[in-house]
Amino acid sequence: MQQRRPVRRALLSVSDKAGIVEFAQALSARGVELLSTGGTARLLAEKGLPVTEVSDYTGFPEMMDGRVKTLHPKVHGGILGRRGQDDAIMEEHLIQPIDMVVVNLYPFAQTVAREGCSLEDAVENIDIGGPTMVRSAAKNHKDVAIVVKSSDYDAIIKEMDDNEGSLTLATRFDLAIKAFEHTAAYDSMIANYFGSMVPAYHGESKEADGRFPRTLNLNFIKKQDMRYGENSHQQAAFYIEENVKEASVATATQVQGKALSYNNIADTDAALECVKEFAEPACVIVKHANPCGVAIGNSILDAYDRAYKTDPTSAFGGIIAFNRELDAETAQAIISRQFVEVIIAPSASEEALKITAAKQNVRVLTCGQWGERVPGLDFKRVNGGLLVQDRDLGMVGAEELRVVTQRQPTEQELRDALFCWKVAKFVKSNAIVYAKNNMTIGIGAGQMSRVYSAKIAGIKAADEGLEVKGSSMASDAFFPFRDGIDAAAAAGVTCVIQPGGSIRDDEVIAAADEHGIAMLFTDMRHFRH
């Protein structure tokens, strides 16, 4: 079953030359004949390796500025030829068998990511010969090894040493899978790039936005298998995007604790994305993908203490996110006070990790400090389809708000309004958030009726003995009726921030005026479903 195949001849043609010299040296030292092209051949020759240019082997020169190098029967016949079946025809046409192909492709993704990249630049970085060789070798994996990742170089040499210069069929099959994944991702990038240019190329309207191509090709890499999904009867895995530049749960490093669950990852993402909204030291506590306590403070310890007070019951078994390094004092406060599933922060001090290590079930993640939020796409799976939209990075500043009531907000009310508006963006709709002195005091999430979300926020504050009088309230969408304002006023809210836009805005504003409430319109909605 091993079906070993000796590696006697290898063709090397790589764009990313990291590790290629050392790999070629190892192959040559084991008696492997080296074929190569262009820059790869020159590099290997400069390092003193015995290498045959493909053009010398085929008797056909590279041409058209390198566009045609390996597209030749003596190359592809050597790769595709079936050992034991095509030997006679290969011998007739002087085609030598090629046992290993080492190829990675022109850097198309890096090229189009560069500012000012032209269509001509992009086109010249579409690899033709490379993918053709990759697919040929992968198709004939029964006889040929295809290597597309430099991370496989060492393992290949080790297996050759363990198998007298041969590779097993299992290894060749695994390498073929990687090869097909590699070319599929490469072609997807090209298709997405060209698809994004359709509107401009054809002079179409803004509605035909290039961010949403006619065909959507997505490429994700499996990071880990999960024990189960959202529920124990569901199987699950976690896939990540390549080359993500922004700090995220997908790129975070787990420095402590047992494996993350499906729900851990979803909740940690919600907590981290919320805490990114704040410049001041901040803490976000999340339960079931909803913030249950958020605060900013003079330090992350202060912020945590205030966030916890919002809803200590819900904080139990929650996810905690910070936008500053986790320090020992804060870690001790958390461990002493509550059970926590995950703590995520840009970094964690050694002293903090010694403290959290006392609780083996606590997972600690570090994600690095983030900069500007990166625009991107959000996806929602529906049965038989996929909804795609821009990532919600919208936010408003004080200068963009419209005061629509007779009373102006005080400075503190305005600060609290902007604070709870940031939080409301991450609460499931219908979302209502009460805040006072830069901390949440009540959160009403996910109710079908907005007025009930407002009532729940008031009940939450009352249950924890938090004073609502003088607080601000944020609503993720407009109030369709005045009842939400009446409920807020009854609880003690004195300032409301909301998008506006209801056909009954006049009634809602009148209700605010009746109660002496200052009301701010953002002209921006933050539904979250």
Swiss-Prot record:
Gene Ontology cellular-component terms listed: cytosol
Name the UniProt record assigns to this protein: Bifunctional purine biosynthesis protein PurH
Any single GO BP term: 'de novo' IMP biosynthetic process
Domain of life (superkingdom): Bacteria
Keyword Transferase: yes
UniProt cross-references to PANTHER family, sorted A to Z: BIFUNCTIONAL PURINE BIOSYNTHESIS PROTEIN ATIC, BIFUNCTIONAL PURINE BIOSYNTHESIS PROTEIN PURH
Species classification: Bacteria, Pseudomonadati, Pseudomonadota, Gammaproteobacteria, Enterobacterales
Alphabetical keyword list: Acetylation, Hydrolase, Multifunctional enzyme, Purine biosynthesis, Transferase
Recorded family membership: Belongs to the PurH family.
PTM sites of type N6-acetyllysine: K287
Gene this chain is encoded by: purH
Catalytic activity: (6R)-10-formyltetrahydrofolate + 5-amino-1-(5-phospho-beta-D-ribosyl)imidazole-4-carboxamide = 5-formamido-1-(5-phospho-D-ribosyl)imidazole-4-carboxamide + (6S)-5,6,7,8-tetrahydrofolate; IMP + H2O = 5-formamido-1-(5-phospho-D-ribosyl)imidazole-4-carboxamide
SMART domains tied to this protein: AICARFT_IMPCHas, MGS
InterPro entries xrefs: AICAR_Tfase_dup_dom_sf, Cytidine_deaminase-like, MGS-like_dom, MGS-like_dom_sf, PurH-like
HAMAP family: PurH (MF_00139)
Domain MGS-like residues, every copy: 1-148
Coiled coil: none
Source organism: Shigella dysenteriae serotype 1 (strain Sd197)
UniProt free text on domains: The IMP cyclohydrolase activity resides in the N-terminal region.
